Amino acid sequence: MPTIQQLVRQAREKVVRKSTAPALKESPQKRGVCTRVYTTTPKKPNSALRKVARVRLTNGIEVTAYIPGIGHNLQEHSVVLVRGGRVKDLPGVRYHIVRGTLDAAGVQNRNQGRSKYGAKRPKK
């Protein structure tokens, strides 16, 4: 237990928390341009073709972002909004593309959890 005088001389060191989405540079989202849209396979116990895109952000950093939802309209040169959030079974994928903004259309025929996929409320 340090004395007060010892703490005056040398204060306690702050614990620095490492960012989980460093490419966003403390922003909630960043805009970017798709450089490549492709599918990849997940880690060991899972099996699928996950849709991902390489995105060059406005700050010049290129990241791999996951395209959530069933079906998408993205291709090379599509302008997208990228948010943080990793995909547990895809190594190196630490970002998500926001559906329903810019060039990324919302998911079709989605009735539950619509706000997460940019889907409008269906007509009665």
Swiss-Prot record:
Any one GO biological process: translation
Location of 3-methylthioaspartic acid modifications: 89
Transmembrane segments: none
SUPFAM superfamilies on file: Nucleic acid-binding proteins
GO CC term (a single one): small ribosomal subunit
InterPro entries: NA-bd_OB-fold, Ribosomal_uS12, Ribosomal_uS12_bac
Gene Ontology MF annotations: rRNA binding; structural constituent of ribosome; tRNA binding
PROSITE patterns noted in UniProt: RIBOSOMAL_S12
Keyword field: Methylation, Ribonucleoprotein, Ribosomal protein, RNA-binding, rRNA-binding, tRNA-binding
Coiled-coil intervals, chain numbering: none
CDD domains for the chain: Ribosomal_S12
Description of how the protein assembles with itself and partners: Part of the 30S ribosomal subunit. Contacts proteins S8 and S17. May interact with IF1 in the 30S initiation complex.
NCBIfam families: rpsL_bact
HAMAP family: Ribosomal_uS12_B (MF_00403_B)
PANTHER family attached to this UniProt entry: 30S RIBOSOMAL PROTEIN S12 FAMILY MEMBER
Recorded family membership: Belongs to the universal ribosomal protein uS12 family.
Function according to Swiss-Prot or TrEMBL: With S4 and S5 plays an important role in translational accuracy. Interacts with and stabilizes bases of the 16S rRNA that are involved in tRNA selection in the A site and with the mRNA backbone. Located at the interface of the 30S and 50S subunits, it traverses the body of the 30S subunit contacting proteins on the other side and probably holding the rRNA structure together. The combined cluster of proteins S8, S12 and S17 appears to hold together the shoulder and platform of the 30S subunit.
Name this protein carries in UniProt: Small ribosomal subunit protein uS12
Gene: rpsL
